[in-house]
Amino acid sequence: MDSAESPTKTQAGEDENYSLLCQAHEQFNNSEFDRCLELLQELETRGESSGPVLRHNRAVVSYYKTGCTQHSVLLKELEALTADADAPGDVSSGLSLKQGAAAATVARYNRAVIYYHRHMFGTALEKLAPLVARLEALEKAMAALVATLQLQLLLATNQLNRAEAFLDYLQYKLNLVATAPSSNAAEEAAVVGTAPPSAATNSSVVASPGGAAVEGAVPGLGGSLQLLQLITLVLNRKPVVIQEDGTPEYAALKAQQYYIMKDFQMAAKQLMRINNECTQAGTITPQLSTCIANNMGVIHLRVRHYAIAAKFFQNALNFDQQLARNLRQSTLQTMSSARSCEILYNLGVAMLHLRRPKEAFQCFLVPVKQFHSNPRLWLRMAEACIMEHEAKLVEEERQSQSETPSTKPYAPQSAGVPEPTLEFAVLCLRSALTLTQHYKTRFHMAAVSSEDVEAPEPKDPTQESWRHPQDNNFCNPSKPVSLESLENMMAAIYAAHSFVSLRLGDHVTALEMSEKLLACERLSDAHKLLGHMYAGEALMLMDKASEARDHLDPTFVGTLNAFDFETRDWQLKSVDAAQNVVRYNLAVAMALQNDLPQAKALLANLTHSLVANKALALRRFMDLKMGPVPGGTPS
């Protein structure tokens, strides 16, 4: 956040007022906030014409005086200040703010900073938009501040393509960041001198260490923009060499680059090195510990070490809770560092893989309040509900076999109650389906516009060009999704919706969802099998056995890919198992149509352990229904 601004003398006849403002600025830097406020009040009583400047500075000083915790009070004052201004920069003042930026401009910037630290990124982008629109007209220092915040917001909202385009705009139009070296061999050789020899042979883009990212004497901004430049390139999978400067920020970015390159072992080693070095130096903080523990959990989750990942996420949550004990009385920096929602999301996914659905559901309840537009999160909640219900069925079956009657039979629950029930799963799946259908429409619109361009156009570093790229960031806080990922998620939602509807006796919806599942593009073989099975079961339950037989034709199973069935916790581990299950269901459909001889012949070939007992029971039922064979002897 911009602090109380240092004065700039603009009129020779205001020496006394200028001296008082200099004293106020000195008192602010010395943390003498009471004395600073007195000097600002004295300036106001003198009829100083820089009313908006004094008003802004007084609000900032009062904010610092209260320990930087009264964000709402400062925000109201800043909103009132910007409301009084017709447009950014219209305020003319005798004693102007640092680098000539107007009070209303800085107030707008500070408002966006507050929203950013509160994790209200969309609102922050909206408040910052007027300043970004006139970025070229701002003073160099103010433009660098606005550009830095805008780039941070684009990255925070996973608008990676737009962030890269905005970075090009800052490089080629405003010259606020160092231009990335070209992949041209001659130009690359000129940059190699600032990088290790190995870096030149492995990368076409080299980040020169220590290069000034901002021209002019703007302390602190150069390094900040340079780091954001590297983060943008890494997240967009651009080849770039990261020169570590001993700070954990660059070291952590190096670990993230390893992770994106799927070198998970090196990513974990890099994070452990950061932890060890900072611990030995005594510079470890709860924020850094939270980041390291969460990222270690993500790495282990990626390599399917779910129990270890869950342990790291729990450690990260403990570190984060040290920061978020009382957010209402926390500073903006502490509030910005809190990551409980993201960590709980990760922990919930790990718990699902560990088949602990109740714990997973409780974890998802917190992030869904913030990321309620994420269809993948709604699907995960539905999966937790389904898994919990199936676990209860297994327990009830075990109790029935041990002759211990269940004392609490299943009863329908309210769909609006956030409990891991099938009724709430339906609500989650409806939300996921509505969001995914909406995002798929938007995705295709963006995809068509991008495919129209056959050859890459030269970069156009203008104010409007960086706004053109679109990002499919539909699943925040996760990274943008691909079209294939979106279609897979759509298929998973249809399959889960059909399954839950069958469990709840809603056969019409189950059939509708299964038919939509079979109509999906790029459908995996596993989902194709589920679609036919669910459709066949729904039709049989609707007394439409003849139509169900069309979905239970076992010939389609032979064309399925066996690798699609190698899913953890699936009972169908092979094509042979799938063939037996489909044939058994087909025999049931035949039995319902009284085609008993053909059904009995089909059952004779079912030997897989999944259906052997059920096939034997069905065969005995048909024997009883068909009666004794003429001339036969009783067995």
Swiss-Prot record:
Which UniProt keywords are listed? Answer: Coiled coil, Cytoplasm, Nucleus, Phosphoprotein, RNA-mediated gene silencing, Transcription, Transcription regulation, Translation regulation
Query: Which cellular component, as a GO term, is one annotated location?
Result: CCR4-NOT complex
Give the UniProt subcellular location, in the record's own words.
Cytoplasm; Nucleus
Task: List, alphabetically, the SUPFAM superfamilies matched.
Answer: TPR-like (SSF48452)
Superkingdom of the organism of origin: Eukaryota
State where composition is biased (Basic and acidic residues): 456-470
What's a single GO BP term from this record? mRNA catabolic process
The record ties this protein, via InterPro entries, to: CNOT10, TPR-like_helical_dom_sf
Which residues are recorded with the post-translational modification Phosphothreonine?
A: 45
Q: Where is this region: Disordered?
A: 396-416, 450-474
Coiled coil regions in record = 131-165
Give the protein family.
Belongs to the CNOT10 family.
Q: What does this protein do?
A: Component of the CCR4-NOT complex which is one of the major cellular mRNA deadenylases and is linked to various cellular processes including bulk mRNA degradation, miRNA-mediated repression, translational repression during translational initiation and general transcription regulation. Additional complex functions may be a consequence of its influence on mRNA expression. Is not required for association of CNOT7 to the CCR4-NOT complex.
Q: How does it assemble?
A: Component of the CCR4-NOT complex. CNOT10 and CNOT11 form a subcomplex docked to the CNOT1 scaffold.
PANTHER family recorded? CCR4-NOT TRANSCRIPTION COMPLEX SUBUNIT 10
Protein name as annotated: CCR4-NOT transcription complex subunit 10
The organism's taxonomic lineage, starting at the top: Eukaryota, Metazoa, Ecdysozoa, Arthropoda, Hexapoda
